[in-house]
Amino acid sequence: MRGTQGAQEMKPELWPEPKPTSENLTSRGSGSYEKVLPSIPAACHTSSSSVCPRRKPRPRPQPRSRSRGGRGLKAPPPPPAKPPPPPPAPPPPPLPKQRSVAWRNSRRRSRPGPRPQTRKSYSSDHGSSRDSDGSENSLLEVGSNKGPTGCCHVESFKVAKNWQRNLRMIYQRFIWSGTPETRKRKAKSCICQICSTHKNRLHSCLSCVFFGCFTDKHIHIHAETTQHNLAVDLCHGVIYCFMCRDYVYDKDIEKIAKETKEKILGLLSSPTGDASYQQLMASEVEENQLTCESKDQETSLVKPKKKRRKKTMYYTVGFRGLINLGNTCFMNCIVQVLTHIPLLKEFFLSNKHKCMMTSPSLCLVCEMSLLFQAMYSGNQSPHIPYKLLHLIWIHAEHLAGYRQQDAQEFLIAILDVLHRHSRDDGIDQEGNSNCCNCIIDHIFTGSLQSDLTCQVCHGVSTTIDPCWDISLDLPGPYTPGRASSSTSSRDGQKPRVISLTDCLKWFTRPEDLGSSAKIKCSQCQSYQESTKQLTMKKLPIVACFHLKRFEHLGKQRRKINSFISFPLELDMTPFLASTKESIMKGQPLTECVPSENKYSLFAVINHHGTLESGHYTSFVRQEKDQWFSCDDAVVTKATMEELLNSEGYLLFYHRQDIEKE
């Protein structure tokens, strides 16, 4: 009976089901019971918990009988589960912080609503001013629907009547203060109308007589309440737009500022000096009604103060030091030169670039726009050009890394990237996409004409190539073919100093190519000896001359430290292709030099040290006779003697006729 075979032949129906009694029910706590089966053979307990554990019943909506075949007791329902405790009540919201009335007024209009096409800006007492002819009108009348490009608010400001005269008066009285008397008057009058101080970047409203602090937002509150959008920085003379929330650049305003400063400095340098300046100010006051003493409500502006600031007469906005990020002096000196080219300055500060790249963060022209804004922001702390360096590494991989690089190589690389990223800004008007007229080509691109003359038939083959700079060989024992250099002394005489003009003459001389470099003539169709001559077919606006001071002859590498003199003014007429053609035709040369061939020295980049270990610095001209020395983060005023005695590696000349415009 205990064997496996006997257990398989047994039938469960032969075992009678005992009736439930109190003996075969086992208590399981909480009043629930479980039926206990009678003792049966071990072979029949195939469903015992020791052999096969009982499956856990699936949860159902209602409990059913747990007996087999409808026999047995129903299990009582389980006790109801306790409901979860309610979540804690959230803490009450903090009370709103009480703000000042000025703060609420400055944040009230987050999105400007529709504005009228024209509006009139009045002075603080809402009175009207009269011109010198007696006609009554507002101080400035602004039309907000003008100006499609650049800052539309500046364009609207220029629509107003007498805006040039009023702006010129502000520059004369409050910005270009050249004499002790004018500086004294400025220290007394130019104070904040709200806090009565002059230390927090004082700005003057261009639409009325109001001075306010920029740091403490007093000028912002005035602009918010009066809708006067433009103000001028009294320290640097730059214009701030409250609608654009940035400093803006305008060519017409810049011209007025420059003319006013030149006029004042010219009067101060005259023999009469202060008297001429005072006479000018008196005449301007008679013609204009824009004066701090004209209104009773603004008499607080002219109260004398014990403390007053000192104002230097040199205008140095734009000259800002650049941090050296690790052997990046070659980049810093090129950036200082590029940011002071007048046409580039006008282009980038006027926001004329239209980025067409899918990733504007990789556009070098967009980064240069931000760099120009940082250089002309008036901030005197050195700028960190890390983003510019990163983009150069991306687009010019041969310059990646913190190794020492060549400044001339970096100049060509950055001009090439700027040219590629700004092609959409200046396509030729005729629709020829092959003829690029971008800002880089417009300023730097010239053309070299190469003439190959056959020695047999005298046929000339001409090739014209564009160029961004001109590399000039230096005289000396390291230059091929210079054994009889003009630097050698003869008969005990002192050697003559080589100039930039001598290098240009050597560059444009006819060169015999020799028998080892025979070229097939296009006319006689035979390989013959020929001569080669380079001339300038087209002159650029900014001419860059590269003095080749680094030479590699076999395994030898050396730097040529020969002194090369360079003039402040340069005439490029003798080196033009048209001049050569006139000489060959026997035509007389005119004594009058065309204005487009005259150049003025604009910047000089110097290399100090050896070929293996060196450093780059630059001299940059701001005005006619004002030169500054830029050595990474240090910018100082330089003398003409320091400039002309420098060694010279890259020389930048600007066309005089365009520079004067």
UniProtKB/Swiss-Prot annotation:
Bias-annotated ranges (Polar residues)? 21-30
Question: What reaction(s) does this enzyme catalyze?
Answer: Thiol-dependent hydrolysis of ester, thioester, amide, peptide and isopeptide bonds formed by the C-terminal Gly of ubiquitin (a 76-residue protein attached to proteins as an intracellular targeting signal)
Q: Locate the active site.
A: C329, H615
Q: Which Pfam families match?
A: UCH, zf-UBP
- The chain positions of domain USP read 320-656
List where Basic residues composition bias occurs. 53-71
GO molecular function per UniProt:
chromatin binding; cysteine-type deubiquitinase activity; histone binding; histone H2A deubiquitinase activity; zinc ion binding
Keywords (A to Z) from UniProt: Chromosome, DNA damage, DNA repair, Hydrolase, Metal-binding, Protease, Thiol protease, Ubl conjugation pathway, Zinc, Zinc-finger
Chain sites annotated for binding Zn(2+) 1:
C151, H153, C241, C244
Assembly with partners or alone: Interacts with H2A.
Tell me if Zinc is a UniProt keyword of this record. yes
Biased composition range(s): Pro residues: 75-96
Give, as residue ranges, the zinc fingers classified UBP-type. 149-267
Known function: Specifically deubiquitinates 'Lys-14' (H2AK13Ub) and 'Lys-16'(H2AK15Ub) of histone H2A regulating the DNA damage response at double-strand breaks (DSBs). USP51 is recruited to chromatin after DNA damage and regulates the dynamic assembly/disassembly of TP53BP1 and BRCA1. Functions in DNA double-strand break repair also by mediating the deubiquitination and subsequent stabilization of DGCR8, leading to the recruitment of DGCR8 binding partners to double strand breaks such as RNF168 or MDC1. In addition, promotes the deubiquitination and stabilization of the transcriptional repressor ZEB1.
Mind telling me which SUPFAM superfamilies this protein's record contains?
Cysteine proteinases, Formin homology 2 domain (FH2 domain), RING/U-box
Q: What is this protein called?
A: Ubiquitin carboxyl-terminal hydrolase 51
* Gene3D superfamilies assigned: Cysteine proteinases, Zinc/RING finger domain, C3HC4 (zinc finger)
EC no. given is 3.4.19.12
Record note on what altering H615R does: Abolishes ability to deubiquitinate histone H2A
Q: Which cellular components does GO assign to this protein?
A: chromosome
Q: Name one GO biological process term.
A: DNA damage response
Which organism encodes this protein?
A: Mus musculus
Q: Where in the cell is it found?
A: Chromosome
User: What domain of life is recorded for the organism?
Assistant: Eukaryota
Residues that coordinate or bind Zn(2+) 3: C205, C208, H222, H228
Report residues binding Zn(2+) 2. Answer: C192, C195, C213, H218
